[in-house]
A protein has these predicted regions:
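Conserved active-site-adjacent core of cysteine acyl-enzyme catalytic domains
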Residues: 63-64, 68-208
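Active-site-adjacent structural segments surrounding the nucleophilic cysteine of cysteine proteases
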Residues: 1-93, 148
Length: 208
């Protein structure tokens, strides 16, 4: 398996042990006792954004690999929105993560180079990993239940950091407790959820 190095995991929610219960609706995210670590203004703001910031959780992992200091999740979101990487319309709908504004922002804010991969295959993702990149892949959030049939592709970002001929290794920011970190799935399974869109972040080029 081609793995660049150990990659720290970051969850979309402050308490990763609550994800199963939050996603299933048994627990309200506003009851997360650890939410203060994300520095949102109030529980409602935390609840609204936690389920929409998979890309920022992936970014935090990348910044940790590079040893780059990062602000709080709420401050990251403010910066991302200021650069157009997320957009909140007047009706409350969120667009994002929007790839090209995101790459412009992380280049300006953290000196982090990257590129968009469109219409890409898992072989292309593997080539990026071999060249020393980490890859944020667009998959269906249904990937947290890989043994069940899915009805969509895309809509959620996971951080791919390893692969071999048959399998893909990744972090899922909204995975259940047993499949959040260093998840290994057969390529054929991952491909069912994969939208063919990704962001490649060349770690070797960005090491300081």
């Amino acid at each position: 398996m081609h793995v660049f190095r150990p990659v720290p995991y970051h969850c979309q929610w402050a308490d990763r042990d609550l994800v199963d219960s939050i996603v299933s609706g048994r627990v309200d995210a506003r009851a997360d006792a650890k939410q203060g670590t994300f520095c949102f203004g109030d529980p409602d703001e935390y609840e609204f954004w936690a389920r929409r910031t998979c890309g920022l959780a992936c970014l935090e992992s990348v910044l940790d690999v590079l040893g780059i200091a990062k602000p709080s999740r709420a401050d990251l979101l403010k910066q991302a929105m200021a650069h157009g990487a997320y957009r909140l319309d007047t009706g409350g709908a969120v667009q994002g993560l929007i790839y090209r504004p995101f790459l412009t922002w992380v280049k300006n804010a953290f000196g982090l180079s990257g590129r968009v991969l469109e219409y890409c295959t898992l072989d292309a993702v593997a080539q990026e990993l071999d060249s020393g990149s980490l890859v944020m892949c667009s998959v269906s959030p249904e990937i947290r239940r890989p043994d069940e049939s899915n009805v969509r592709r895309g809509g959620h970002l996971v951080l791919v950091h390893g692969c071999d001929v048959d399998t893909i290794r990744f972090h899922n920011p909204s995975g259940f407790r047993h499949n959040q970190e260093n998840v290994v799935l057969p390529r054929t399974t991952f491909e069912r959820f994969f939208a063919g869109r990704a962001l490649s972040l060349p770690i070797l080029e960005n090491v300081r």
